[in-house]
Amino acid sequence: MSNTSEDNITVRFVTENDKEGWQRLWKSYQDFYEVSFPDDLDDFNFGRFLDPNIKMWAAVAVESSSEKIIGMINFFNHMTTWDFKDKIYINDLYVDENSRVKGAGGKLIQFVYDEADKLGTPSVYWCTDESNHRAQLLYVKVGYKAPKILYKRKGY
């Protein structure tokens, strides 16, 4: 187990130098959800995170004492017909298994909340698998479970 504590964790936007650490967690995230994406999608997404003209971002949780990236969150801005203000969708959130329950997940979500407020888009939402009970223990502390059911187009 890591010695990571909430006070020892900083969250910041990714930089070009973070690609390897972000990619390591991105691959672990895919393993967790038993999915696999092509490697060139990593480059494509990371490029979008760094492009100031694209409203898609990534942030990382860094263990201050070791400078190790222990968590990542990917999020983007979109319009809605339900409000004049845009919304923020958290697309992906992952914390290294050895660093969980130390505050990184909550700090990553709070980072998105803070950025959403700065953008004037305070509405932030995300979804998770019904079976991801451990994550839901955090999510009910930082948000609420919406009474919605997600449907998807068959085959996609």
Swiss-Prot record:
The keyword Acyltransferase applies. The keyword Cytoplasm does not apply. PROSITE patterns: GNAT (PS51186). Autoacetylates in an intermolecular reaction. It comes from the Eukaryota. Signal peptide: none annotated. Its EC number is 2.3.1.48. One of its GO terms (biological process) is polyamine acetylation. The record marks Y139 as: Important for catalytic activity. It catalyses: L-lysyl-[protein] + acetyl-CoA = N(6)-acetyl-L-lysyl-[protein] + CoA + H(+). GO terms for cellular component: cytoplasm; Hpa2 acetyltransferase complex; nucleus. Residues 9-156 form the N-acetyltransferase domain. InterPro entries: Acyl_CoA_acyltransferase (IPR016181), Diverse_Substrate_AcTransf (IPR051016), GNAT_dom (IPR000182). Keywords: Acyltransferase, Chromatin regulator, Transferase. Pfam families: Acetyltransf_1. GO terms for molecular function: histone acetyltransferase activity; identical protein binding; N-acetyltransferase activity. Acetyl-CoA binds at L93, Y94, V95, D96, E97, N98, S99, R100, V101, K102, G103, A104, G105, G106. Gene3D superfamilies: 3.40.630.30. N-acetyltransferase that acetylates histone H3 at 'Lys-14' and histone H4 at 'Lys-5' and 'Lys-12'. Also acetylates polyamines like putrescine, spermidine and spermine, and certain other small basic proteins like nuclear HMG proteins. Forms homodimers in the absence, and homotetramers in the presence of acetyl-CoA. Belongs to the acetyltransferase family. GNAT subfamily. This is Histone acetyltransferase HPA2. The lineage of its organism: Eukaryota, Fungi, Dikarya, Ascomycota, Saccharomycotina. The gene is HPA2.
